[in-house]
Amino acid sequence: MKKVKVQDAVGLTLCHDITAMRDGFKGAAFKRGHVIEEGDVEKLLDLGKRTVFIWEENAGEIHEEDAARRMAAVAQVEGCHYTEPSEGKVLLMADTRGMFRVDTALLNQVNSIGDLTISTLPDHFPVEAGDRLASMRIVPLVTQETQILEAERLCQGKKLLDLRPYHPRKTGVIITGSEIYTGRIKDKFEPVVRAKLAHYPGEILGVTICDDDLNMIVDTAKGYLAQGADFLIFTGGMSVDPDDLTPTAIRQLGAEIITHGVPAQPGNMTLVAYLGDVPILGVPGAAISMPTTIFDVLLPQIYAGDRLTHEDLIRLGDGGLCRLCKPCHFPTCTFGRY
């Protein structure tokens, strides 16, 4: 790579994109590989470019675009594609819906290699097809190939980035509470749960309202399991009051309760359990009064096939406080980012 005055660069090949910013536009005015013409000189000067870099290949060096392609190659993600390099960077784009995962420890290692930079959406972020997930580039126009080789070594056999698509689930919904069962109070959980599950593939096998009767709750859950349910949602009866039977019913099913209570608000009293491979969520009343609770944070992980651990749920504390923005713009916010 050689630096030359623009007046002396006519007939030479540009080795980098040159960016223009004007009237809301930001993009490449000149692309790498462009052969500079007489008419380009004034345009380059207007962009503040008195000098440009002309490509001269040196052993052991790698150009920014080639480096970006090599960086993308170490982080191939099924269900995604990379753009062609532009202005020295490549973008990872989602081709499907799902939950984006990042090996943050490995990402920090790669970003500690000299000139390499990879920026991503947060780990556990729910994404839609067409979303931009990551950007990769080196800081200078060229770098030593040894830096790329080190990134390739670190990432070999590992998943730096991943997109886990949502899988269909058959869900049984069990609403508990004598006040609802007897008709004294109108149920408000069903429309909320249906609206939230509508964002994910699968079907709701049914919604059953149960009295505060342990056997009724357990038998209803067993009935859904017999129909092939692979996800159970319980609402109501999630507090620590002695007559709140939902946690007891879940235990009586034979499920392992991972936690009853999470360090996140709204939704502190959320219960997470597993009966074999069947996830079970106990959803507290905050889901009725708040547009977003920890229920919304956990659903993408369940539909993406993650098995939630106690450690996962403890980590919710950092980012677990909803700011109660009006209007709510979850998930493009701080809530549930861990």
Each model region followed by its residue ranges:
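Short, low-complexity N-terminal leaders and the immediately following helix N-cap/first helix
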Residues: 1-87
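Solvent-exposed alpha-helices and their adjacent loops that cap or buttress functional pockets
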Residues: 7-11, 22, 28, 82-85, ...
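Residue-level recognition of short, solvent-exposed, well-ordered loop/turn junctions
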Residues: 31, 37, 122, 126-129, ...
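C-terminal terminal segments
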Residues: 32, 84, 99-118, 125-128, ...
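Flexible, glycine/charged-enriched surface loops at secondary-structure junctions
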Residues: 54-55, 80-85, 143-145, 203-207, ...
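Extended, charged alpha/beta regions that create polyanion-binding interfaces
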Residues: 58-166
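Glycine-rich phosphate/diphosphate-binding loop of Rossmann-like nucleotide-binding domains
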Residues: 157-212, 216-218
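Short glycine/threonine-rich loop/turn motifs
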Residues: 178, 205-332, 336
